């Protein structure tokens, strides 16, 4: 099936099969489709709403074409989000990665520069001094030795270059927002993924189940964050042992009062880094305490998913210890040094 045939099908409101989506995405990723065709296809998919087969097929192609990072550590975990929630919060999932590493985990962090928000994970790590151009073998050794490594998406998904122009010009959420978190180059099978709408929680968990994931939490807060919130309950779809279960996570159950999010939105990578460093240093200001709380609840989920804790509640307690001990700050320092040797 070529992209013109696929476009006609999707515009008519019909879903593509998984195999058909594999064909079309292969054409897109190999430069066989024009920018106009790619843009039209992305918009048509969005308007129809992407099916499980379509998302699965597209993810399979991206995974196949990715430049892999081979890591020997067990129970790798990733903390990431689709973006697009419009909240412009500081980089919570990026900060959480260092907390998980400090708690004894191995985090294969996958991310990019910002497309729609003020700062992406790559932007804030670059501002901190992490070398985004580190070779795959350096990233692998960082994950194994430091406990966290960063995989800059464009360096590992070079075939994506054909879709970059249409994505930027459209400036809309597309299937690629979902695919990024599902195409980790290290092949992680354990993840906490934030999404921009609760409607995506179950579908993404089911797709990851099809793709072989072991333990995943897909989260979206009731106040619209692609993170677990400290200001409202969050909707969660958890994939574990091949079964998807949906439930709410209430911050009050983890010792967090319903704190507002005032001051946690940022306009630059430097501002985001400032909030992260404040939380990592244990600053006692209200703002740093709020930042630490939202980092802890998200890191706690990842610590649990990574198999380091028997429950999310235990994971949150471990995250708080990693923050208060200064170990999370040390992990950030170690990654900066490791990638700049």
Curated annotation (Swiss-Prot):
Binds 2 magnesium ions per monomer. Signal peptide: none annotated. 5-phospho-alpha-D-ribose 1-diphosphate binds at residues 81, 84-85, 91-94, 109-117, 121. Anthranilate 1 binds at residues 81, 112. It catalyses: N-(5-phospho-beta-D-ribosyl)anthranilate + diphosphate = 5-phospho-alpha-D-ribose 1-diphosphate + anthranilate. Anthranilate 2 binds at residue 167. Pathway: Amino-acid biosynthesis; L-tryptophan biosynthesis; L-tryptophan from chorismate: step 2/5. Its cofactor is Mg(2+). GO terms for molecular function: anthranilate phosphoribosyltransferase activity; magnesium ion binding. Transmembrane segments: none annotated. Its EC number is 2.4.2.18. Mg(2+) 1 binds at residues 93, 227. SUPFAM superfamilies: Nucleoside phosphorylase/phosphoribosyltransferase catalytic domain (SSF52418), Nucleoside phosphorylase/phosphoribosyltransferase N-terminal domain (SSF47648). It comes from the Bacteria. Belongs to the anthranilate phosphoribosyltransferase family. Homodimer. Catalyzes the transfer of the phosphoribosyl group of 5-phosphorylribose-1-pyrophosphate (PRPP) to anthranilate to yield N-(5'-phosphoribosyl)-anthranilate (PRA). This is Anthranilate phosphoribosyltransferase. The lineage of its organism: Bacteria, Pseudomonadati, Pseudomonadota, Gammaproteobacteria, Cellvibrionales. The gene is trpD.
